[in-house]
Amino acid sequence: GLGIRYTAHDEVPSVAEFAQRVCSRLLQRADSAGLQPPRLILEPGRSIVGEAGVTLYTVGVVKRIPGLRTYVSVDGGLSDNPRPALYGAVYEAVVANRADQPPAEWVRVAGKHCETDTLIEEAHIQSVQAGDLLAVFATGAYNYAMSSNYNRFPRPAVVLCADGRAELIVRRESLEDLVAHDIIPAHLS
């Protein structure tokens, strides 16, 4: 399907450009193989909702290592956005409660899971401190669908914001949700 802009550097073709590229190559291949042109149906994929999603994280610890880098740990990670770990997906972020200020530092955004859990390798963001809200853009396509209870972490809530309103459309999972299907054998209880 058609891609989206995850970062300001991403170049995404228009629908017409994408169709022209795919169709011209497909027609060339069919012709060179002596085949009739096939009927091609493409799904729009992430282009419908990808850019509409923004994930908000609360900043936990900010660790500044002079001469090396600054790490910003957040209250999410691999369980709510596995794409950086699985595909090397790249995202951009802003400190939401300071979005009106210019970027001030380069940081690495780390998730809360026990293994290498890096959400963003290099983010140019506003000055950041514990308790800030970090907004990560273009998370509307696959984040929720790919989220999991990895390491027994509950999934976050999903809020629909439109026309000046914010409405809860998926509630945050609770401890009860996490253990709802667990069974303790009688001899162990």
Annotate the PLM regions:
Residues R21, L35-S189:
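Charged (often Lys/Glu-rich) extended helix/loop segments that serve as interaction or gating elements
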